[in-house]
Amino acid sequence: MELFDLTIHELHDRLKRKELSSVEATRAMLARIEAVDPKVNAYITVTPEEALAAAEAADRRIAAGDMAPLTGIPVALKDIFVTKGIRTTCASKILDNFVPPYDGTAVAKLKEAGAVIVGKLNQDEFAMGSSGESSAFGPTRNPWNLECIPGGSSSGSAAAIAARTATATLGTDTGGSIRQPASHCGCVGLRPTYGRVSRYGVIAYASSLDQVGPVTRDVTDCALMLQAVAGHDPMDSTSVEVPVPDYAKGLTGDVKGLKLGLPKEYYIEGLDPDVKKALDEAIETYRGLGAEFVDISLPHTDYAVATYYLIATAEASSNLARYEGVRFGHRTEGAANLIDMFRKTRSEGFGDEVKRRIMIGTYALSSGYYDAYYLKAQKVRTLIMQDFLKAFEAVDAILTPVAPTPAFKIGEKTSDPLRMYLSDIFTIPVNLAGTCAVSVPAGMSGAGLPIGLQLIGRPFGEETILRAAHAFEQATAWHTQKAGI
């Protein structure tokens, strides 16, 4: 097995036994990136000098007996996290030359744990997209089929795991942006509860929906990554001061008596036959493990996509107002006056999908439409939250598809934004409810593309869904399959 094939816990064991050094593991990963990434385009920026310096520091820590689970592990970050001294673009021309003066909290925590950051990953521009196609640096490709999308917006975060060009990655999830690409790329992807992980130093898309989470090769790695970044942060007023359990210790493999809900609104006509088959087989696997199933209803699911695209775009139109060419980022040349500079800078700097969402959000917030659209969407959001809270009175977790279909071809849905938006129909409600969910590999399509299942947990119930995901993983072999790239 190559060094770049190892999971976090496998690599940790070898580093601990001094069978190899972090420098060796990092060099192997950098060589893998150089060999494979030109085909996949998962990276925007690779940082070999910084990575090797961090690996040398990690080796010194290990030699001194100061070793955490992530010490010396090569990881990569979605290019939405600000990184001190390293270009941070959010996959947008408007931030092409932006080099932040500080690290975001999640980045700082990874560094404190001794992780080695090898680069910044491609994504949909400003995290707005479901396919990885809206990046100013070109689309990310799915390592399982280079003609297909990897999912979005954390496209590079999942593609790098599938291509084995990072041992683990961090992404963000606003409407499914970790879980959907994890499903399409055959990885484990976790969206923690809103407030579980600090958003300080994450470039904002929709502040009430964004959340930081890991993408990994297996559930144990996912638990280790969450352990490293979770916790209260005084720099983020939305982070919540609740205890952080030992997630890896909770992976017992025991789900006997666990009650799993099956929402009728998610098992609908039009679900791809391969996705339905994978979910049916997963249900039987859980039955064999002793889990119990309860039919439930989440009655306001039908309104989730419309609600999301009003709230998220409204928040985006406000958050993205700061990019005007004065303080940082791209500034147009030869503007006649200040207003002309604002207009031209934003016209040149933002891509089509970002402009579309800014316009939708500005319209929803405009005088005469605020009550009819934005305020009504917030009321529906409350109903969706209440649906989940009621369901969790009867069940411990909810089992659903992640996406209605496996990965589709690049360019297939770009001309039809509504079809693209519906790709996230099963993931968006979780963000609106502010709770947690994990995607875990559960099958393959007839065309050889991965399919994931989604486990949704109570607020701050990450321990339960990780335990359930781990039990499924132990009973199946889907997570061991590798893209032939």
UniProtKB/Swiss-Prot annotation:
Pfam families: Amidase
GO biological process terms held by the UniProt record: translation
Reactions it catalyzes: L-glutamyl-tRNA(Gln) + L-glutamine + ATP + H2O = L-glutaminyl-tRNA(Gln) + L-glutamate + ADP + phosphate + H(+)
GO molecular function terms listed in the Swiss-Prot or TrEMBL record: ATP binding; glutaminyl-tRNA synthase (glutamine-hydrolyzing) activity
Extent of the signal sequence: none
Family annotation (InterPro entries): Amidase (IPR000120), Amidase_CS (IPR020556), Amidase_dom (IPR023631), AS_sf (IPR036928), GatA (IPR004412)
Role summary: Allows the formation of correctly charged Gln-tRNA(Gln) through the transamidation of misacylated Glu-tRNA(Gln) in organisms which lack glutaminyl-tRNA synthetase. The reaction takes place in the presence of glutamine and ATP through an activated gamma-phospho-Glu-tRNA(Gln).
Protein name: Glutamyl-tRNA(Gln) amidotransferase subunit A
Taxonomic lineage of the native organism: Bacteria, Pseudomonadati, Thermodesulfobacteriota, Desulfuromonadia, Geobacterales
